[in-house]
Swiss-Prot record:
Stretches with biased composition (Basic and acidic residues): 1334-1344, 1358-1370, 1430-1442, 1456-1466
Organism ancestry: Eukaryota, Metazoa, Chordata, Craniata, Vertebrata
Catalyzed reaction equations: ATP-dependent breakage, passage and rejoining of double-stranded DNA
Motif window: Nuclear export signal: 1034-1044
Gene name of this polypeptide: TOP2B
Name of the protein: DNA topoisomerase 2-beta
Cofactor detail note: Binds two Mg(2+) per subunit. The magnesium ions form salt bridges with both the protein and the DNA. Can also accept other divalent metal cations, such as Mn(2+) or Ca(2+).
PROSITE patterns cross-referenced by the UniProt entry: TOPO_IIA, TOPOISOMERASE_II, TOPRIM
Linked residues for Glycyl lysine isopeptide (Lys-Gly) (interchain with G-Cter in SUMO2): 33-34, 177-178, 228, 299, 367, 373, 437, 439, 446, 600, 605, 635, 643, 646, 676, 712, 1092, 1214, 1217, 1226-1227, 1250, 1262, 1271, 1323, 1327, 1398, 1440, 1456, 1490
Length: 1626
């Protein structure tokens, strides 16, 4: 049968008659008759074909020849681009015309030869021979030959079976996993069918025979098989002559040969260990990597660099190469040596991995802001894959697209991190970013109009010039003003110069720093787009020539901003905007500025204008009688009147300053100021400026200024280095605190105002903010000031250790990190009683106060008695520098100061955060680990009772527990439920999970799994020193020592001042007493005498002119000599003139002074003042300091005691006055918030973290050359929590404990601090602070005075208090008002959000996410609620003091060196806070005390001693120690389950076995203990949750029993092995 248009062979093919005939199947005549018959049928539609002729059956062979496209693809010529190998060119992609069917039958034989390598690993060679002239193709391999044996079933030889009969194959056993290309049993047979001659030769050494047989005429005819005896090596050779007529070809043309040649090269690259000979020559390919070079040879990327190929042999089955593609996605892949030209699942499998990694890198580097999708990344990839897949499947017999699912591949391709890192550096990422920039530029260009319009619409607040966009557009100037008020000023001035050539457009604050902004930011920035639209600018257009400038609507831009530092910043940002996008415009004088006076001095009708403060200061120095001049400061353009505006514009020559381009130095200056890449240069720039300013001040030289009377123009270099640098420096001053007082200017202004107001009653925060702005000349928004006030008053965990303002109202909690503070309109505050003890008023006389707007404001810095920068920590990001300091314990600092006063070195200190109950451990220098607290309660319950510092409760719940409960795309659900029992000050999550998952989680580390461990490096301790210069400090001790030296010198100055002042007052009282006595004795008469005579008489009799006034005038004169530039009015110095003596202090005394009582009182005052002066002279500056410290510690005790009482008032379970109800309800509710008494504490393990920290430190030492200052970046990381375990690191003692019996407790100085609990030095967790570019225009991202301190709390240890020595109160008899204190904060507070370290507990750097496995054998994990293992009795003696546990908290651990023991005497160790939780232990219990931890090795978490119960307290008889680590330092009691409590005996003296035991079920019984009476609460208290102030003597013997009680939440677990929780808090 023949059909027109079908595939045929024989004489009719290519004859042009359009009829194809099957010569070998049908007779020619029959075929012709059939054709005639069909023609007749067409002519006669009434005749129909028979059913037999319509429905036919063909043999398999007939079907293959009739429908070849089903088997080998199309037999029609196809033209397309393909990779081919040409002898003259090599591997290249060009347009070729070939027949896919012919290419396929060749490929089938070639793949069969390659498959033999998989069957025979000894195969080493494949020979391919193509003879186009004779149309002969031969493929030979030396692999194992085909068995030359007769098939017992089919009765033919195996070679004849598999090459000459259809549907025969060795690949039908799908249970056998093979990595060959053959699959369906068609391949070689198809080649036979479509060949005129097909010869098989094979030799099998195993069967010692060779075989040769030939088929002809499309497998229709065959010759007899020739079988011979054979003793040589195995081989197989297939030789065939394609039936070209079937493919409509006459010969093997150049294109098909080039394609076949490429397939030979493919084989050489994809068959490992096989050499390929082509036409007798060995192909120069050695492995897959060299094969890939054939493709990329001589190819360059867009930068002209040769393509870089990344290669990785993932395993024996996967070989992957990657490089950059510039023609969209390209892939060259092989599956079992089959060329999958269309790719498939194997390609997607590899490419998806690569794209996933690359897109992460691109997103990090993508500053353009254009969203990048995976397919766009894929378009830049060229991947080469050679893989072996088990039993691959394809979508057709052509095998161009592999369809097998990855799970069935039989192997995995896990590419290494090294591969991905290299992939991100091979040019792909750069190419993607270039494409992103191009796309971004295209989008930006759409924002610009290439058409010049005379009128534009849709831009609000634009006052367009009338000639803008017309023929005079180049003569038009656009005035850009700072805000609407400045626009009003400009519009007023336009009345003088006209509106035709001047347009006005107001800016809303600072514009965007386009040099570092993302594409998205630029696209969405309305101001940038408006300026471009108004001026007519076009991106990427060069304005080099005058002709191009004619396309602009305005020929110039005039910048009109305030004359302050923020105004300078706006000018700089506009210059940066033009320079970054159109640098050529600067060369045409495109920019200019309009300046206005910053100060005006007027006298009579004379008026002088000054355009910079240094210029004004210079004028003041040389002017006489400056008080006759009226001085007015202009802080903004809004200060000027409309009349003044007209005056400014009328004198345009004076007020317009042109910017001139001076060459590359201008470009360099602009880049220096605004480029992120110039951060180190910017540091040096600012350092040089500060040093220059310092030297000028030392030598009395004036500061540099720009705008003199003759200034008409300036270069960009001058603007950057003389004006803009002032903003950069002020940016640092706003953001980085002073070492001396720890304040930023805004905070200092608040404190100054509070000192000046000296409120005795609380005041609203909003009202106080207004008062601060008024009294301290605060020039920024009051909202930021209110937040600064709120921040100073916050006292929750993670904020301030000492809050200087009182939080009266809702000032924020740890639930939201302070963000839940109420509106400033509703909350109140006032000075803390500690404030004036930390900042003594007498020191105000020694400070250098600043002046602003001719107003005396806050001092340069206050001088506290201890370094507040360490107490409350510090954090800020400025220009070039950043600062980060954690909090430290006030009492520890006080003790170190005392040591230094005694000539000793300070002890090392660890971060400490008030009321933090977790552990803080030192990893290395300035590196700490912060851990929360987690307990295992039972087989499927854990309890989280503390979070890492600055991990806020709500954030933790949403970002950690919720994903654990619900699961995410990447991780399955881990927990089954959780409940919350926390308060605003405490944390308690009760988490439920399956026993198997809990076992797995504990094996992986509960702290890691629940993200309760964070790390932080503190290498950014940058502060302003007392000279106003930035300085980087390496250690906290360096800060303490520098502060100590400065503070001690100021105590010397204070003594001098006091001696002088008190001496003058003593002289005054002495003169007054002498005058009264002489008057009474009649030695002096004043009646009826002239004033002049009286003064003369007093002078003659040796009376001194007012000594107090004279002394004060002398002090003022000295101050004026030191700083003559600040000669301002001062009310305290106007009481008299130095021209003559002043005896008003004597002559103004009332007649009452002559009475006997007044005389005696005056004499007493004189004598007392004399003694006061003598006492003062005998004291050293150190004595004065110690008195201040004692008074401070005494008040600190009172404040913290009051805090505890305040909390107790609402939590003790007592009925409140006026309230009706049962306190039992409150008790039950309260117990819910308490930790479970059955929990087994999990000890944080930091061994792995220490190793990581050490590695980072080594790397830093190798590459760290920056010793002057730190980069604007924090090295803090959220590091993965290590596996838990009882490690020495967790219990290393801060103070080694003496072994022998303790002596009787002695009284100690107030403030003495004994660290009882091993504390770990950890730092607060924080999300990687996103670094703010200090040059950002965005006000919302500017600096903030709000300090988000890094809370890391070490439990405060108890101390024995005595009444602090009464600090002398110096009384001064002069009545003049005290000098005002002021607090300067030029801080924008704009960087509030970015300066906040957003506590995120979610990241664990370098740690894999924990994914629980469901297949854990229960035997692998066992809870051991059994009894604890007995430990040597000696361990008890290692523990010398035990504290009772705080029911609401757990102590923090601090690692310290053993020499810390010298810090406190042995008696101090006896005093432990009621709130430092620890428990008495059995003799047999293993005590993980400090000594045990340090000397005995690691305590096991399964063998932790039980906490003992404290006796129920009756009432508080002693003030509880304020060193407590508890919330607000509140004493708390623990309760235990019924039947488990011990006898309710009090602690005994050293050696008592009952010490530390505690029984909430009984009343406290008296004992013979010599210890002070224990603190207890009223017996009617239903819930005794706070242990009282027990003496912390060492326990000697254990108690044996426990009293039972129903509901207990915080005591020891029933299972002794689970009691690791509280006993180790020593």
């Amino acid at each position: 049968m023949a059909k027109s248009g079908g595939c045929g062979a024989g004489a009719g093919v290519g004859g042009g008659n359009g009829a194809l005939t099957w010569v070998t199947l049908f007779d020619q005549n029959n075929a012709a008759k059939k054709e005639e018959s069909e023609t007749a049928n067409k002519n006669d539609s009434s005749k129909k074909l028979s059913v037999e002729r319509v429905y036919q059956k063909k043999t398999q062979l007939e079907h293959i020849l009739l429908r070849p496209d089903t088997y080998i693809g199309s037999v029609e010529p196809l033209t397309q681009f393909m990779w081919v190998y040409d002898e003259d060119v090599g591997m290249n992609c060009r347009e070729v015309t070939f027949v896919p069917g012919l290419y396929k039958i060749f490929d089938e034989i070639l793949v069969n030869a390659a498959d033999n390598k998989q069957r025979d690993k000894n195969m080493t060679c494949i020979k391919v021979s193509i003879d186009p002239e004779s149309n002969i193709i031969s493929i030979w391999n030396n692999g194992k030959g085909i068995p030359v044996v007769e098939h017992k079933v089919e009765k033919v030889y195996v070679p004849a079976l598999i090459f000459g009969q259809l549907l025969t194959s060795s690949n039908y056993d799908d249970d056998e996993k093979k990595v060959t290309g053959g699959r369906n049993g068609y391949g070689a047979k198809l080649c036979n069918i479509f060949s005129t001659k097909f010869t098989v030769e094979t030799a099998c050494k195993e069967y010692k025979h060779s075989f040769k047989q030939t088929w002809m005429n499309n497998m229709m005819k065959t010759s007899e098989a020739k079988i011979k005896h054979f003793d040589g090596e195995d081989y197989t050779c297939i030789t065939f002559q394609p039936d070209l007529s079937k493919f409509k070809m006459e010969k093997l043309d150049k294109d098909i040969v080039a394609l076949m040649t490429r397939r030979a090269y493919d084989l050489a690259g994809s068959c490992r260990g096989v050499k390929v000979m082509f036409n007798g020559k060995k192909l120069p390919v050695n492995g897959f990597r060299s094969y890939v070079d054939l493709y990329v040879k001589d190819k360059l990327d867009e930068t002209g660099v040769a393509l870089k190929v990344i290669h990785e042999l993932a395993n024996e089955r996967w070989d992957v190469c990657l490089t950059l593609s510039e023609k969209g996605f390209q892939q060259i892949s092989f599956v079992n040596s089959i060329a999958t030209t269309k790719g498939g699942r194997h390609v997607d499998y590899v490419v998806d991995q690569v794209v996933g990694k690359l897109i992460e890198v691109v997103k990090k580097k993508n500053k353009a802001g254009v969203s990048v999708k995976p397919f766009q990344v894929k378009n830049h990839i060229w991947v080469f894959i050679n893989c072996l897949i088990e039993n691959p499947t394809f979508d057709s017999q052509t095998k161009e697209n592999m369809t097998l699912q990855p799970k069935s591949f039989g192997s995995k391709c896990q590419l290494s991190e090294k591969f991905f890192k290299a992939a991100s550096n091979c040019g792909i990422v750069e190419s993607i970013l270039n494409w992103v920039k191009f796309k971004a530029q295209t989008q930006l260009n759409k924002k610009c109009s290439s058409v010049k319009y005379s009128k534009i619409k849709g831009i609000p607040k634009l006052d367009d010039a009338n000639d803008a966009g017309g023929k005079h557009s180049l003569e038009c100037t656009l005035i850009l003003t700072e805000g609407d008020s400045a626009k009003s000023l400009a519009v007023s001035g336009l009345g003088v110069i006209g509106r035709d050539r001047y347009g006005v457009f107001p800016l809303r604050g600072k514009i965007l720093n386009v040099r570092e902004a993302s594409h998205k930011q630029i696209m969405e920035n309305a101001e940038i787009n408006n300026i471009i639209k108004i001026v007519g600018l076009q991106y990427k257009k060069s304005y080099d020539d005058a002709e191009s400038l004619k396309t602009l609507r305005y020929g110039k831009i005039m910048i009109m901003t305030d004359q302050d530092q923020d105004g300078s910043h706006i000018k700089g940002l506009l210059i940066n905007f033009i320079h970054h996008n159109w640098p050529s415009l600067l060369k045409h004088g495109f920019l200019e500025e309009f300046i206005t006076p910053i100060v005006k001095a007027s006298k009579n009708k004379q008026e002088l204008s000054f355009y910079s403060i240094p210029e004004f200061d210079e004028w003041k120095k040389h002017i006489e009688n400056q008080k006759a001049w009226k001085i007015k400061y202009y802080k903004g353009l809004g200060t000027s009147t409309a009349k003044e505006a007209k005056e400014y514009f009328a004198d345009m020559e004076r007020h317009r300053i042109l910017f001139r381009y001076a060459g590359p130095e201008d470009d360099a200056a602009i880049t220096l100021a605004f480029s992120k890449k110039k951060i180190d240069d910017r540091k040096e720039w600012l350092t040089n400026f500060m040093e220059d300013r310092r030297q000028r001040r030392l030598h009395g030289l004036p500061e540099q200024f720009l705008y003199g009377t003759a200034t008409k123009h300036l270069t960009y270099n001058d603007f950057i280095n003389k004006e803009l640098i002032l903003f950069s420096n002020s940016d640092n001053e706003r953001s980085i605190p002073s070492l001396v007082d720890g304040f930023k200017p805004g905070q200092r202004k608040v404190l100054f105002t509070c000192f000046k107001r000296n409120d005795k009653r609380e005041v609203k925060v909003a009202q106080l903010a207004g008062s601060v702005a008024e009294m301290s000349a605060y020039h920024h928004g009051e909202q930021a000031l209110m937040m600064t006030i709120v921040n100073l008053a916050q006292n929750f965990v993670g904020s301030n250790n000492i809050n200087l303002l009182q939080p009266i109202g809702q000032f924020g909690t740890r639930l939201h990190g302070g963000k839940d503070a109420a509106s400033p309109r509703y909350i109140f505050t006032m000075l803390s009683t500690l404030a004036r003890l930390l900042f003594p008023a007498v020191d105000d006389n020694l400070l250098k106060f600043l002046y602003d707007d001719n107003q005396r404001v806050e001092p340069e810095w206050y001088i506290p008695i201890i370094p507040m920068v360490l107490i409350n920590g510090a954090e800020g990001i400025g220009t070039g520098w950043a600062c980060k300091l954690p909090n430290y314990d006030a009492r520890e600092i006080v003790n170190n100061v005392r040591r230094m006063l005694d000539g000793l070195d300070p002890h090392p200190m660890l971060p400490n955060y008030k009321n933090f109950k977790g552990t803080i451990q030192e990893l290395g220098q300035n590196q700490y680990a912060v851990s929360g607290e987690i307990f295992v309660v039972d087989r499927n319950t854990v309890e989280i009772t503390e979070l890492p510092v600055r991990t806020w409760t709500q954030v933790y719940k949403e970002q950690v527990l919720e994903p654990m409960l619900n699961g995410t795309d990447k991780t399955p659900a881990l927990i089954s439920d959780y409940k919350e029992y926390h308060t605003d000050t405490t944390v308690k999550f009760v988490v439920k999970m399956t026993e198997e998952k809990l076992a797995q989680a504990e094996a992986a580390g509960l702290h890691k799994v629940f993200k309760l461990q964070t790390t932080l490096t503190c290498n950014s301790m940058v502060l302003f020193d007392h000279m106003g210069c930035l300085k980087k400090y390496e250690t906290v001790q360096d800060i303490l020592k520098e502060f100590f030296d400065l503070r001690l010198s100021y105590y010397g100055l204070r003594k001098e001042w006091l001696v002088g002042m008190l001496g003058a007052e003593s002289t005054k009282l002495n003169n007054q007493a002498r005058f009264i006595l002489e008057k009474i004795q009649g030695k002096i008469t004043i009646e009826n005498r002239s004033k002049k005579d009286l003064i003369q008489m007093l002078v003659q009799r040796g009376y001194e002119s007012d000594p107090v006034k004279a002394w004060k005038e002398a002090q003022e004169k000295a101050a004026e000599e030191d700083e003559t530039q600040n000669q301002h009015d001062d009310s305290s110095s106007d009481s008299g003139t130095p021209s003559g003596p002043d005896f008003n202090y004597i002559l103004n005394m009332s007649l009452w002074s002559l009475t006997k009582e007044k005389v005696e009182e005056l004499i007493k005052q004189r004598d007392a003042k004399g003694r006061e002066v003598n006492d003062l002279k005998r004291k050293s500056p150190s004595d004065l300091w110690k008195e201040d410290l004692a008074a401070f510690v005494e008040e600190l005790d009172k404040v913290e005691s009051q805090e505890r009482e305040d909390v107790l008032a609402g939590m003790s379970g007592k009925a409140i006055k006026g309230k009706v109800g049962k306190p039992k309800v409150k008790k039950l509710q309260l117990e819910e918030t308490m930790p479970s008494p059955y929990g087994r504490r999990i000890i944080p393990e930091i061994t792995a973290m220490k190793a990581d920290a050490s590695k980072k430190l080594l790397k830093k030492k190798k590459g760290d050359l920056d010793t002057a200052a730190v980069k604007v970046e924090f090295d803090e990381e959220f590091s993965g929590a290590p596996v838990e375990g009882a490690g020495e690191e967790a219990l290393t003692p801060s103070v080694p404990i003496n072994k022998g019996p303790k002596p009787k407790r002695e009284k100690k100085e107030p403030g003495t601090r004994v660290r009882k609990t091993p504390t770990s030095s950890g730092k607060p967790s924080a999300k990687k602070v996103k670094k703010r570019n200090p040059w950002s225009d965005d006000e919302s991202k500017s600096e903030s005075d709000l300090e988000e301190t890094e809370p890391v709390v070490i439990p405060r240890d108890s101390l024995l208090r005595r009444a602090a020595a009464e600090r002398p109160k110096y009384t001064f008899d002069f009545s003049e008002e005290e000098d005002d204190d002021a607090d300067d904060d030029d801080d924008d507070n704009n960087d509030l959000e970015e300066l906040k370290v957003k506590a995120s507990p979610i990241t664990n750097d370098g740690e894999d996410e924990f994914v629980p496995s469901d297949g854990l054998d229960k035997d692998e994990y066992t809870f051991s609620p059994g009894k604890s293992k007995a430990t040597p009795e000696k361990s008890l003696h290692d523990k010398k003091s035990q504290d009772f546990g705080n029911l609401f908290s757990f102590p923090s651990y601090s690692q310290k060196s053993e020499d810390d023991s010298a810090k406190f005497d042995s008696n101090e160790e006896d005093s432990a806070s009621v709130f430092s939780p620890s428990f008495g232990l059995k003799q047999t219990d293993k005590v993980p005390s400090k000594t045990v931890a340090a000397k005995k090795g690691k305590p096991s978490s399964d063998t932790v001693p039980k906490p003992k119960r404290a006796p129920k307290q009756k009432k508080v008889v002693e003030a509880v120690n304020s060193d407590s680590d508890s919330e607000f330092g509140i004493p708390k009691k623990t309760t235990t389950p019924k039947g488990k409590g011990r006898g309710a005996k009090k602690r005994k003296a050293s050696g008592s076995e009952n010490e530390g035991d505690y029984n909430p079920g009984r009343k406290t019984s008296k004992t013979t203990s010599k210890k002070p009476k224990k603190t207890s609460f009223d017996q009617d208290s239903d819930v005794d949750i706070f242990p009282s102030d027990f003496p912390t003597e060492p326990p000697s013997l254990p108690r044996t029993g426990r009293a039972r009680k129903e509901v207990k939440y915080f005591a020891e677990s029933d299972e002794e092995e689970d009691d690791v929780d509280f006993a180790m808090f020593n």
